[in-house]
Amino acid sequence: MLDKTWQKMYEEAKSVQKFRQISDHLEAGGVAAAVLSNTGRIYTGVCIDTACTLGVCAERNALFNMITCGENHFKRVLAIMSNGKDGAPCGACREFMVQLMEKDYKNIEVLMDYDREEITTLGELTPDWWL
């Protein structure tokens, strides 16, 4: 069984996942994410999709919230897709995470599937960084 922290992260991400059409060119909330900072605080974010591709993924949005609140390091991340399933961060999110925690990124835990309790690490998903 997933520990209580994973469960709380999942619940908090689910609570902000509210799809909404903001304008003819912008929608938000289809995907939601939660990150666990090294201090134990959970930060959430939702994806923001725009017609001109200037949107942002839920994972990066959650990390931006963490950074805005003065924290710079995290140890866990999860994302809930629009179909209710969990999934791996996209390439852009992985790149951002690696740049944020260049020396420690390989140990960041990623929830791949809540129902199957499948967890991997960012190091497994991104074994070699291009820089």
Predicted features along the sequence, with ranges:
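Feature captures the catalytic cores and cofactor-binding loops of soluble hydro-lyases/lyases
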Residues: 61, 65-68, 89
